[in-house]
């Protein structure tokens, strides 16, 4: 329920409003929040900004989360980010937000936020890191993989692996998939693009999500 092209502050408010708008019969329901890429700092910001939301959350699960930002944003513009709306399967759409996603993902911004804010201690945090072998990187992402590799070769084409980890979280998976393959099913709906530009997009996403939710559920239940 967030705008992929807006700031973490904007999207944190959207998350809060969505949860607040759930039917009254679900008011006591405990929540597990699952985020991908920029969705993770959106969730973390929501927990800090809205304590009433944090009280309802049992766990936050990060998949290739942009927790510490991305060095690629240092030379990026919001206009380039807006081009994500044309990527098949990305689900990035132009919304009526603040159009400030890129600034929210700059490493200095994210690191400053992490230094200035304490994550709620009642919530369990889990991180799944994407770290593909070179032959598992799609052609369209090769350049960003190499550019980011000048900072750290241990990256998923968009994020360095250490920037994907929520502080104090349990690292429960290191996945051999690039940043798109883990969550954006380009090849399923666009076979030509999937066979050429995004040619390493085959990943069993549904099975992965089922496994991670089962893991988190069992981990939580053991402590209750």
Task: State the predicted function of each range.
Residues 4-15, 39, 205:
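Phosphate/oxyanion-binding active-site loops and adjacent basic polyanion-contact surfaces
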Residues 13-115:
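Serine-dependent carboxylesterase/thioesterase catalytic core
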Residues 7, 42, 103-106, 160, ...:
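Helix N-terminus capping/helix-initiation residues
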Residues 10, 29, 120:
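Short, well-structured alpha-helical interface segments that form or flank functional binding sites
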Residues 6, 40, 69, 134, ...:
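Flexible, glycine-rich phosphate/dinucleotide-binding loops
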Residues 6, 31-33, 223-224:
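Extracytoplasmic low-complexity repetitive segments enriched in small/polar residues
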Residues 120-224:
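C-terminal catalytic-base region of ester-bond hydrolases, centering on the histidine
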Residues 1-5, 61:
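Conserved alpha/beta-hydrolase
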């Amino acid at each position: 329920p967030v705008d992929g092209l807006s700031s973490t502050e904007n999207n944190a408010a959207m998350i809060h409003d969505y949860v607040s708008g759930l039917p009254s019969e679900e008011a006591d329901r405990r929540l597990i929040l699952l985020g991908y890429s920029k969705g993770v700092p959106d969730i973390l910001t929501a927990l800090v900004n809205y304590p009433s939301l944090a009280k309802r959350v049992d766990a936050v699960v990060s998949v290739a989360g942009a927790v510490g930002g991305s060095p690629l944003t240092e030379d990026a513009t919001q206009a380039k980010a807006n081009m994500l709306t044309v990527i098949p399967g990305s689900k990035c759409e132009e919304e009526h937000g603040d159009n400030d996603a890129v600034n929210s993902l700059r490493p200095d911004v994210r690191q400053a936020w992490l230094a200035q804010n304490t994550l709620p201690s009642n919530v369990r945090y889990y991180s799944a890191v994407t770290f593909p072998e070179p032959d598992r990187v799609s052609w369209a992402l090769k350049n960003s993989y190499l550019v980011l590799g000048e900072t750290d070769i241990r990256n998923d084409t968009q994020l360095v692996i250490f920037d994907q980890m929520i502080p104090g979280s349990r690292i429960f998976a290191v996945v051999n998939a690039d940043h798109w393959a883990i969550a954006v099913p380009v090849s399923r709906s666009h076979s030509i693009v999937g066979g050429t530009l995004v040619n390493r997009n085959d990943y069993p996403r549904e099975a992965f999500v089922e496994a991670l939710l089962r893991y988190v559920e069992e981990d939580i239940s053991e402590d209750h």
